[in-house]
Amino acid sequence: MPIVKVRENEPFDVALRRFKRSCEKAGILADVRAREFYEKPTTARKRAKAAAVKRLAKKLSRENARRVRLY
């Protein structure tokens, strides 16, 4: 759990912004959204595999674009 200590003479808005940023870095909101509804194990595996395929395609396209620029 992210903890933010409010500094002396620090506006509340700034402290709240720091807290939100620390929550974002910790991945709390993403975790809550992922656990909001039950996801069947088969669906989770399918989603993870699709994400891996997408990452691989993105990596290959970046490598191909770099090769084209070298010539």
From Swiss-Prot:
Transmembrane segments: none annotated. InterPro entries: Ribosomal_bS21, Ribosomal_bS21_CS, Ribosomal_bS21_sf. Belongs to the bacterial ribosomal protein bS21 family. The keyword Ribonucleoprotein applies. HAMAP family: Ribosomal_bS21. This is Small ribosomal subunit protein bS21. GO terms for cellular component: ribonucleoprotein complex; ribosome. GO terms for molecular function: structural constituent of ribosome. Pfam families: Ribosomal_S21. Gene3D superfamilies: Ribosomal protein S8 (1.20.5.1150). It comes from the Bacteria. Keywords: Ribonucleoprotein, Ribosomal protein. PANTHER family: MITOCHONDRIAL 28S RIBOSOMAL PROTEIN S21, SMALL RIBOSOMAL SUBUNIT PROTEIN BS21. The keyword Nucleotide-binding does not apply. It comes from Shewanella amazonensis (strain ATCC BAA-1098 / SB2B). GO terms for biological process: translation.
